[in-house]
Design a protein with these regions (language model features):
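Buried hydrophobic positions in well-ordered alpha/beta secondary-structure cores of metabolic enzymes
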Residues: 25, 36, 87, 118, ...
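Internal helix-loop-helix
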Residues: 63-132, 174-180
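Hydrophobic, small-residue-rich alpha-helical packing segments that form membrane-like cores
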Residues: 147-148, 163
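Flexible, small-/acidic-enriched active-site or ligand-binding loops
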Residues: 151, 200-218
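A structural signal for short hydrophobic beta-strand segments in well-ordered beta-sheet cores
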Residues: 154-157
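A short core secondary-structure module
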Residues: 161-162, 166-207
């Protein structure tokens, strides 16, 4: 009896996910799958070997609605989280570096702006991030404490007209090519605050880490 039930399992879809999806979710999944197989897969080996990131990938993802896909409004498609998970799985199927590029842009850059930013900030950044015209990164992890937010050394000191931020971040995906930086720091009271920085601001640098062992295409 046990042998018969074992043989009846569909190993291509053991959790029967396919029959649980809606038509819209399948369409999103198939779109991401086609993009991954036709656009990303042919060049991933060379990108991995050379540690190169093709900036056009962001624009191609944006044109298909794959960036900031769960956000409603601001030129974003507003799909459900199941669809977002399916997108991530299809991009991850090709390379985790490409998935990292997409998920950092969507979940760690666009979502914080959408959830906590002012209306002016949302209108300024989200449409351009959704198309891939702008590239973003998420600056939490630091050399000394890793991703332990409670141990942040980076400080945001109140000054006339705003804040002066000092500190260092490490292992920040997308940072060497980013236009928008979501940076987390402790303020004068020791509370963690998020800041939006832009490429070219005085004192801001994002050198590329050479010789990575993984995520080399991102």
């Amino acid at each position: 009896m046990a042998g018969n039930s074992w043989k009846s399992i569909n190993w291509k879809d053991p959790f029967l996910l396919e029959q649980q999806l809606t038509d819209d979710q399948r369409l999103v999944r198939d779109t991401a799958h086609q993009f991954g197989q036709e656009k990303l897969l042919p060049g991933v080996r060379e990108a991995f070997r050379k540690e190169e990131t093709d900036l056009n990938i962001f624009k191609e993802m944006g044109s298909l609605g794959l960036l900031g896909s769960t956000i409603h409004g601001y030129d974003c498609p507003g799909v459900d989280y199941m669809s977002y998970g399916l997108i991530a799985r299809e991009i991850e199927r090709v390379d985790s570096g490409y998935r990292s590029m997409m998920s950092v842009q969507s979940s760690l850059v666009m979502y914080p702006i959408y959830a906590f930013g002012s209306e002016q900030q949302k209108e300024r950044y989200l449409p351009a991030l959704s198309t891939g015209e702008l590239i973003g990164c998420f600056g939490l992890t630091e050399p000394d404490y890793g991703s332990d937010a409670g141990g942040l050394i980076t400080r945001a000191k109140s000054v006339k007209g705003g804040y002066s931020i000092s500190g260092a971040k490490m292992w920040i995906s997308n940072s060497p090519i980013a236009d928008v930086f979501i940076v987390w720091a402790k303020n004068d009271e020791g509370k963690i605050k998020g800041f939006i920085l832009e490429k070219g601001m005085e004192g801001l640098s994002a050198p590329k880490i050479e010789g990575k062992l993984a995520l080399r295409a991102s």
